[in-house]
Amino acid sequence: MVPSVMEGAPQLGITSTDTSSAGVPPGLKLIPTDRLDRRTDEEIAAWLQTRHPVTSDKNVWAFWHNGYTNMPPWVQRNIINWVRRLGPDWTVHLLDRVDGSATNVSHYVDSSFFPECFNNNTMDGPTVGQHSGDLVRLPLLWLYGGIWIDAGSFLFRHVEDICWNKIEDPESPYEMAGFVIEMRPGVEVMLNGFIAAKRGNPFIKRWLEIFKKLWDGATNVQGFHKHPLLRHLPMLCPPIDKLNLPPQGLNVVMEQFTDYMSQIMSFERLRKLVDPSDGFNGPEYYSNKMLLCSALQETFYFQLVTEWSGTKQFNLLSTKRKGEGVVKDENWHAAENFVHDALANTATMKLSHGPPGALDSFLADLWDSEEHHGKDNEDGTFAAYLRYGSVHFDQTREMVPIKMGWPDEEVLEAGVLEPKK
């Protein structure tokens, strides 16, 4: 039996009248209900645990290594809301590595795409789930096309409006899309939590080849920054001032941080590589064929305005918005501004668990804890209102892409899997 994901909270679906008294906030408009998936949350939850045929490139891919029923309830609600928001034209595939599961990734991707440690279940270390997801996402996009979204993400805008309409437009130069952030002073780096491309994309193919190669003989990512394919690249070092990080910065050694981000480092290799054997030009592709938007605006805006404090985010969203005893004090208005700002001005909200220990607190960790399992959707709170708005509101703003030029850093002329000499 599929467990309910509502934890006693009112259903987010079609009958809610949450905005009837407050009206629609500035920068937003109501989505007609006929554009939404009208099934109950329980029906969508059951549907997510069955295998669905791939009939087009309009796929949203996500992964949870030990399956839907082992997801924290807040993550389950994320995926359910994607299905409801995206409607019938898009298929959300939530894959796993559970033996006998109808949604096991092995039904979609041949073992030849994965390293030995993945196929033999010998990956180790504290980030097996995260890096299993890294290994899965690129083969899925290469084989089937669509959009990879990390399961810990809220979706505040339809994926067609974020990027897909432009990828599908024959008059548009764009073939891939994602979000970039300054990971070294003056250097914008594309993240891997939101990746869009049609099947057979040439950049995706080479990217997955590089990342898979890192895993030869490995069972975790430790030391990947020293791998022959990556060792010529500068290590990641996010600028504290530009990201509005806490004064102490990230509580992590940069070598370990760079290893954790090794799939992003594989991207970095490829975007600065020209392959003379087949003419592939990474800088040209990155500059002209990728639709890139600011991650600080489109996925980490909530972090930027709270100094990356999970505790601060938790307290804002746990604030009572309506009901008996509500006092509209300074904290209430801060919570309202936070939620309205997120709903109107950022495309997604990605909650992560790591790198482990990098920050003093992560909202994902707080919502993971059993004592807080319903806090992301507790009746009458701003968290529940954020959930409601993520399904029922459309943004009126236009997203503005960033134009990337030719990299200022060294461009490597070599084969995709050829180390720098």
UniProtKB/Swiss-Prot annotation:
Q: Which UniProt key words apply to this protein?
A: Glycosyltransferase, Transferase
What protein name applies here? O-glycosyltransferase braB
**EC number(s) for this protein?**
2.4.1.-
Family that this chain belongs to: Belongs to the afumC glycosyltransferase family.
Pathway info: Secondary metabolite biosynthesis
Q: What class of enzyme is it?
A: transferase
The organism named in the record is: Annulohypoxylon truncatum
Using the record for this protein, list the coiled-coil segments as residue ranges, or answer none: none
Pfam families found in the cross-reference section: Caps_synth
Q: Respond yes or no to whether keyword Transferase is given for this record.
A: yes
Example of a GO MF term:
mannosyltransferase activity
Biased composition annotated in UniProt, kind: Polar residues: 13-22
Primary gene name: braB
UniProt-listed GO biological process terms? mannosyl-inositol phosphorylceramide biosynthetic process
InterPro entries reported for this sequence: AfumC-like_glycosyl_Trfase, Glycosyltransferase_domain, Nucleotide-diphossugar_trans
User: What is this protein's function?
Assistant: O-glycosyltransferase; part of the gene cluster that mediates the biosynthesis of the brasilane terpene glycosides brasilane D and E. The biosynthesis starts with the activity of the terpene cyclase braA that converts farnesyl pyrophosphate into the sesquiterpene alcohol trichobrasilenol. Subsequently, trichobrasilenol is glycosylated by the O-glycosyltransferase braB putatively using UDP-GlcNAc as sugar donor to yield brasilane A. The latter then undergoes two rounds of oxidation performed by the cytochrome P450 monooxygenase braC.
> What's in the GO CC field?
membrane
Q: Region annotation Disordered: residue ranges?
A: 1-26
Q: Is Hydrolase given among the entry's keywords?
A: no
